[in-house]
Structure formats: C-alpha cells, structure tokens
Amino acid sequence: MSYVDAGFILSVAMFAQLPATLSAHALEKATGGRGLLIVMAMALAALSCWGILYLPLDWAVWMAILFGLATGTVFSRGMALMVERARTPSEAIRLSGMSQGIGFTMGAALSLLFTSFLHQGGSFLPFCLVYTFFCVLGMISGRMSAQPGYL
C-alpha cells in the first residue's frame, strides 16, 4: 500500500468516528446498557484492525469505516462515563486526567512496541496481538466501569 493510500485509509477511519461519536448515546439506549455497547465496540475495533492488516486491500476502506465507528463509539462513551460517574466537577477533572495519562501512556507503548516489532521481524502479527490485548483490557474495564456504584 502506498503512503497516499494509507493516508486515505486513515482519513476514512477518522471521518467515520464522527457519526459514531454523535450517535453513541442513542446506540447505548438501543443496546440496553453502556457495558454491552463498549464490549461490542471494542470487539469491532480489534476485528477491524485485523481486517485492515490481513484482508485483501479491497476490504481496507470498509474495515477503516468499521474501525472509525468502533473507536468513535468507545471514545464518546468513555468521556461520558467520567462525567456520569463523578460526584463533583473536580472529581470529573481528576478522572479525566487519570484516564488521559493512562491512555496516552498505553498509546505510546503500543507505538513503541509496534515499531520494535517491525524492525525485528517485519510482521504485523505482534502489533495485532498487542492491540487485541489492549482491546480486551478495554472491554473488561468498560464492563466494570458501566456497573452502578463503580466509583
């Protein structure tokens, strides 16, 4: 895949996040709870990541759309959970800071691991496995934080 095509696929994924972010609340009500929606979205994110890297290139745009929808949903619900769970505005700020710190650290670790895996073997498989592991962690924490009285 050329750099231009890869940039296009990334742009499609980012553009697909917008409708998911805006409709995540309605999807939450339709699925009957935030925990189920987070698990479904994280599973879709993991599967679409595998699809982008391993399915034929004809599927890349569709997988990027699914990836964008999944990540947009997770981001929207994650931000809403912090606000819904906080008892005070200052608690919401502390939760936001903590989650951003953890999220950016995990994102940086994933980038570092991905680069080191590519330099050593040139395979996308370790990246997909690590990303899937992070998605499973997201499913577990999403289900736990969606329970009443979690904080």
Tell me what each language-model feature is.
Residues 73-87:
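Intracellular juxtamembrane helix-capping segments at the cytosolic ends
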Residues 123, 129-151:
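Multi-pass alpha-helical transporter architecture, strongest
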Residues 58-67:
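Paired small-residue
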Residues 7-17, 99, 103, 134:
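Transmembrane alpha-helical segments of major facilitator superfamily
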Residues 20-33:
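Helix-to-loop junctions at the C-terminal end of transmembrane segments
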